[in-house]
Amino acid sequence: LLTSKQRAKLRGMANTMNAIIRIGKEGITERVLKQIDEALTARELIKITLEKNCDKNPKEAMAYICEKLNAEPVQVIGRKIVIYRMSEENPRIQI
């Protein structure tokens, strides 16, 4: 689990990031989870946008994704989600 200071640092880093994954009307499918998993492996910290036609609540979506992919929730702002998972082989972000 992340401490509040670690989460604050990650929020600051995510502030300038663009969302690299968009979740639309199909919702969170296995294909989307695979994309998120690959992005987390490559980048550790990612931002996801839930489109307006997505039926999931952003907080529920973040909890579901984090549970499925063993990631840490960082932040929800509107329809944007920020999640973090430390790379086991090559950690890039020092928190």
Q: What is the predicted role of each segment?
A:
Residues 1-95:
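Positively charged, polar, low-complexity stretches
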